[in-house]
């Protein structure tokens, strides 16, 4: 059976380790959230958190994430030093017995949603992506040069119609959702309390004005080639998270979006320590992806699994659905991974807001009751499968 893990945001997380022990969690997915991006994770700091986790009868199974700084992605002047620091952190993790590291190579912005509490008929809510509202943010709020070329005439007309009715409060909420609330708690570039987040965001976008898809791919290859000797020496598996959503946004290149992209980076640095975080939610948000076929093809190079599902809607919109439904096909994925690469760490990724979760101040997507329900569903499925 897959290892049942849970993303936990450290000692300040409102969801405590004793709570997780009680609901069947075995492994913890976490990071040194107090260490600034690009600085070295010391053996002392790693072991301190590891010992704390183990004191509650749990284990630190996966690092999510050891952030890859922007200067590595766009090949800035600080790249070499940042890669050296990254290599030291990986070595220290390996020395401490933590062997799986999830990361992403998305420029500037991590996962993108436009609504953090989109209602369902049953009274729960989940994360939602509205393409027209995102286009409005891109064209009318960011005022990105050439943005209109990335949208159809019909979409541009809908943006114009939205501009007539959207309120200032709704604009502020859109900014907060897209570049603050969903980013800051995952080692993002903009955090709660930052002044003029739009200006900061525009400066970050400008860093990539000369970086196209090929250049970003080459920078990823360079990074992976540099760190693989350390991964081999200490037995650390790197597993890149797919782009979320898996298509180009804001004129930025995205290079982990589909079967060809995954095949490219696995072949570019063909090493068993260079692998994939199979995020069913991210991949299923693209209608071009069939998660079942991708799992069959890449199971052997998968080191970590995120179980989450989405439902595609009209106009390029999507919503995070129940773990029992949607385009993620999670039942099939569990079967595939158990057959092809058994024992992988798995975490239920995101969950609906329910039973008062929305009042607890949890990070977006990371409810307690919603994820607990999803975990119980996945444990039940896996247990049934073992007995059939």
What label would you give each PLM region?
Residues 13-37:
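N-terminal ordered "arm"
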Residues 2-5, 10, 18-21, 54, ...:
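Histidine-acidic metal/acid-base catalytic patches
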Residues 34, 67, 107-108, 245:
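Conserved beta-strand edge residues that scaffold enzyme active sites
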Residues 31-47, 250:
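Glycine-rich, proline-tolerant flexible connector loops at the mouths of alpha/beta enzymes
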Residues 22-23, 58-73:
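A short glycine/small-residue-enriched secondary-structure motif
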Residues 42-65, 82, 90:
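An N-terminal, globular interaction/scaffold subdomain
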Residues 50-61, 98-196:
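Glycine-rich, aromatic-flanked loop segments that form ligand/cofactor-binding clefts
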């Amino acid at each position: 059976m897959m290892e049942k893990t849970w993303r936990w945001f450290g000692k300040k997380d409102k969801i405590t380790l004793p709570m997780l022990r009680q609901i069947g969690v075995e492994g913890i997915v976490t990071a040194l959230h107090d260490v600034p991006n690009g600085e070295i994770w010391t053996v002392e700091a790693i072991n301190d958190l590891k010992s704390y986790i183990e004191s509650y009868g749990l284990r630190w199974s996966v690092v999510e994430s050891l952030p890859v700084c922007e200067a590595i992605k766009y090949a800035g002047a600080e790249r070499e030093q940042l890669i050296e620091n990254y290599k030291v952190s990986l070595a220290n993790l390996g020395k401490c017995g933590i062997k799986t590291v999830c990361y992403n190579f998305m420029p500037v912005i991590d996962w993108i949603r436009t609504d953090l509490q989109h209602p369902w008929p049953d009274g729960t809510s989940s994360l939602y992506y509205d393409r027209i509202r995102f286009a409005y943010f891109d064209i009318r709020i960011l005022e990105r040069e050439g943005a209109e070329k990335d949208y159809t005439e019909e979409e541009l007309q809908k943006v114009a119609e939205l501009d007539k009715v959207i309120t200032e409060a709704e604009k502020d909420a859109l900014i907060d959702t897209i570049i603050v609330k969903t980013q800051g708690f995952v080692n993002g570039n903009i955090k709660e309390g930052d002044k003029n987040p739009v200006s900061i965001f525009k400066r970050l976008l400008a860093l990539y004005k000369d970086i196209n898809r090929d250049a970003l791919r080459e920078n990823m290859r360079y990074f992976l080639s540099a760190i693989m000797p350390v991964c081999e020496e200490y037995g650390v598996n790197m597993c890149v998270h797919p782009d979320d959503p898996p298509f180009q946004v804001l004129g930025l290149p995205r290079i982990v979006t589909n079967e060809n992209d995954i095949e490219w980076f696995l072949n570019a640095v063909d090493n068993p320590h260079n692998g994939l975080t199979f995020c069913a939610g991210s991949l299923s948000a693209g209608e071009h992806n069939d998660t079942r076929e991708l799992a069959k093809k890449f199971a052997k190079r998968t080191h970590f699994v995120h179980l989450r599902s989405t439902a595609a809607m009209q106009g390029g919109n999507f919503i995070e659905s129940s773990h029992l439904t949607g385009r993620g096909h999670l039942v099939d994925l569990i079967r595939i991974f158990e057959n092809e690469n058994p024992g992988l760490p798995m975490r239920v990724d995101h969950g609906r807001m329910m039973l008062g979760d929305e009042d607890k101040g949890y990070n977006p997507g990371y409810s307690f009751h919603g994820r607990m329900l999803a975990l119980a569903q996945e444990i039940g499925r896996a247990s049934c499968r073992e007995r059939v």
